[in-house]
Amino acid sequence: MNIMKKSFLGAVLSLGLLSAAHADVYKFDNTHTNAVFNIDHFQTSTNHGGFYAISGELKYQPEKQDAEMRVTIPVSALNTGVDAFDNHIRSSDILDAEKYPEIVFKSTKWHFEDNKPVSIDGLLTMKGVTKPVTLTTTKFGCYMSPIFKAQVCGGDFVTQIDRTQWGGDYLVDMGMTKVVDIKIQAEAVKQ
């Protein structure tokens, strides 16, 4: 009887591993993937910038409402449209790109409604600090790309972070906000 239970358990576990191994793998298309941030500048105007050379991988199984994602953002890819401002944000005052050249997001749980993701919980690592973040989905879909001749899935996501949780306290003591709004546009191509 014990042997039968162990055999059954082994078969069930094998099926679970097999289905996880068959998740469709997608690579992010960096021409359609970016992360843009907005931060209030002393209650006068809003500073904008973004990262445009994002790479990563998505494992997606919509029928099982399951997905995994890992995204890497090189700090060197920062672009505000003003070189001097880019260099200041990359400096040790703010992101310290020399010491921490990458920002990484790794999903921990996807939440679905009607087979579409509505939010993604994950861990954001920035300046050597890892904290939980939730991305809210504002749009998501998949289509057959006429360019890649493959399925592409992607969407728009938003979140808000307190930058001081990652050691980003530059000018907070002088009244600049801690809150950073982040908008992400992402598309990934099935491999």
Where in the sequence are the language-model features?
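Bacterial N-terminal signal peptides that target proteins for export
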Residues: M1-A11
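Low-complexity, acidic/polar, glycine-enriched regions of mature
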Residues: H22-Q191
